[in-house]
């Protein structure tokens, strides 16, 4: 078959060249309109701003509009909110409250063609988290805890040390007093017991130790004084 192999080799190059020329001459205006994925839900706190985006592959001439499906009324027609602001069709809701809850849907349309619609983003409005009584950073909290530990250690060590020194001083003082009492008790250590008994006999005099009170009248009884 004349010219068969050469024709087969030139066929892939021709197809690639035609595809490249069609992509260059047609440009983005002849491409199909499609949209990027959007987040399924968006959570904001009460009083904050909510930002919705509608990314798509269309040119700047595309018309982006936003619609809201009311919460609990999905069978009703969606509520028109207005056009998007930038090329991504961003919708900003300021100072969000509970009434802004619902599903937000964006529509992109080029000219008279049919529009493309996103799957929708559900807006959830929550109460702001309670602020702590002492709104401090982690570094400040760590420094406060360190200072508290030092103060507790000081309060535990200093009184205990003072009590130990006081107890030691009392023990030393009691030791000295006990030594003085021991010396006072030994003042008469060198006296003779016979001298002590002689002194006792002299103090008693010639009176007997016992009296015969049976032969005396009651008025004449004289008892020995100790």
Curated annotation (Swiss-Prot):
Q: SUPFAM superfamilies from the xrefs?
A: Immunoglobulin
**Extracellular side of membrane:** 33-143
The stretches that face the Cytoplasmic side, renumbered to this chain, are 166-226
Which keywords are on file for this protein? Adaptive immunity, Cell membrane, Disulfide bond, Glycoprotein, Immunity, Immunoglobulin domain, Membrane, Methylation, Phosphoprotein, Receptor, Signal, Transmembrane, Transmembrane helix
The membrane topology noted for this protein in its Swiss-Prot or TrEMBL record is:
Single-pass type I membrane protein
Q: What is the effect of changing residue 156 to W?
A: Blocks IgM BCR assembly
Q: Which segments constitute the Ig-like C2-type domain? A: 33-116
- Main localization is membrane
What is the name attached to this protein's record? Answer: B-cell antigen receptor complex-associated protein alpha chain
Tissue specificity comment: B-cells.
Which organism is this protein's natural source? Homo sapiens
Subunit composition and interactions: Heterodimer of alpha and beta chains; disulfide-linked. Part of the B-cell antigen receptor complex where the alpha/beta chain heterodimer is non-covalently associated with an antigen-specific membrane-bound surface immunoglobulin of two heavy chains and two light chains. Interacts through its phosphorylated ITAM domain with the SH2 domains of SYK which stimulates SYK autophosphorylation and activation.
Q: Which GO terms describe its cellular component?
A: B cell receptor complex; external side of plasma membrane; IgM B cell receptor complex; membrane raft; multivesicular body; plasma membrane
Regarding how it is modified after translation, the entry says: Phosphorylated on tyrosine, serine and threonine residues upon B-cell activation. Phosphorylation of tyrosine residues by Src-family kinases is an early and essential feature of the BCR signaling cascade. The phosphorylated tyrosines serve as docking sites for SH2-domain containing kinases, leading to their activation which in turn leads to phosphorylation of downstream targets. Phosphorylated by LYN. Phosphorylation of serine and threonine residues may prevent subsequent tyrosine phosphorylation. Arginine methylation in the ITAM domain may interfere with the binding of SYK. It promotes signals leading to B-cell differentiation.
- Which InterPro entries would you find in this protein's record? Ig-like_dom, Ig-like_dom_sf, Ig-like_fold, Ig_sub, Ig_sub2, Phos_immunorcpt_sig_ITAM
**Pfam families to which the protein is assigned, alphabetical:** Ig_3, ITAM
UniProt domain ITAM: residue ranges: 177-205
